[in-house]
């Protein structure tokens, strides 16, 4: 099937380990865009961050933010959830673990809770969710713990973004490096894991890059362009 769009994670996928954008990934993204392939940034970060990144990087596709809970395209934002139970959870976590802290981006978030992973581990968060009987899931992105409704994930966000583009999710190639990219892998037509990704992501990928971080992201994009016939091998 012809790939009509590329969705790609930001942190660890088009960046250096220190989260600075990698110039080779920028080059690859702009090559895809020049060939008429819209690139969609998909991130656990806020929609405001994703919108700004899209402008600076030069992507034309929708942005999928907050792990799939927020989509922005052509100055229109769509939110797929609210945060009622997330705040119940956070209040309980703070009682038990006073040193736990959320991301500094929380005031801008509308679809999920982000807890800094160095202050509490994901299994503890999952245990508290279970004890409270909350309809929430906790996922470790490698940078933070994302807590959200079960139906909020990168796959759901990509499906909504595809509606806006007028294409099918199976016409998208997704590139990522974290556990939270698994749901994206379930809906797209082609799946690429970056070299430093966890084994569970690599096991579900069609292709695993040789390079890590932003160099791997660039390798992945050029691989998609070649296997889809947009570039020669």
Curated annotation (Swiss-Prot):
Any one GO MF term held by the record is: phosphoglycolate phosphatase activity
CDD domains of this UniProt entry?
HAD_Pase
Q: Which residues form the active site?
A: 9
Entry GO terms, CC: cytosol
Q: Specify which residues bind substrate according to the UniProt entry for this protein.
A: 154
Q: Which reaction does it catalyse?
A: 2-phosphoglycolate + H2O = glycolate + phosphate
Tell me where on the tree of life, at the top rank, the source sits.
Archaea
Q: Which UniProt keywords apply?
A: Carbohydrate metabolism, Hydrolase, Magnesium, Metal-binding
Binding residues for Mg(2+): 9, 11, 177, 181
Q: What class of enzyme is it?
A: hydrolase
Q: What cofactor does its activity depend on?
A: Mg(2+)
Q: Identify the EC number(s).
A: 3.1.3.18
Q: Which family does it belong to?
A: Belongs to the archaeal SPP-like hydrolase family.
In its UniProt entry, what is this protein called?
A: Phosphoglycolate phosphatase
């Amino acid at each position: 099937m012809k790939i009509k769009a590329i969705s790609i994670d930001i942190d660890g996928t088009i960046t250096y380990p220190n989260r600075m954008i990698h110039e080779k990934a920028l080059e690859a993204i702009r090559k895809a865009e020049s060939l008429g392939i819209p690139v969609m940034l998909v991130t656990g970060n806020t929609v405001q961050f994703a919108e700004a990144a899209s402008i600076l990087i030069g992507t034309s596709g929708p942005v999928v933010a907050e792990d799939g809970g927020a989509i922005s395209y052509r100055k229109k934002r769509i939110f797929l959830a609210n945060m009622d139970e997330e705040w119940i959870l956070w209040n309980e976590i703070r009682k038990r673990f006073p040193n736990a802290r959320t991301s500094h981006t929380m005031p801008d978030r509308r679809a999920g809770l982000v807890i800094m992973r160095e202050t509490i581990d994901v299994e503890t968060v999952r245990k508290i969710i279970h004890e409270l009987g909350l309809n929430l899931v906790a996922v470790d992105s490698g940078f933070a713990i994302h807590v959200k409704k079960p139906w909020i994930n990168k796959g759901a966000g990509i499906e909504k973004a595809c509606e806006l583009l007028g294409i099918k999710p199976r016409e998208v190639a997704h590139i990522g490096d974290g556990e939270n990219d698994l749901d994206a892998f379930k809906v797209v037509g082609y799946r690429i894991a970056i070299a430093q990704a966890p084994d569970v992501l690599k096991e579900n990928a069609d292709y695993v890059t040789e390079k890590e971080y932003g160099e791997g992201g660039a390798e992945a994009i050029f691989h998609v362009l070649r296997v889809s016939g947009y570039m020669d091998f």
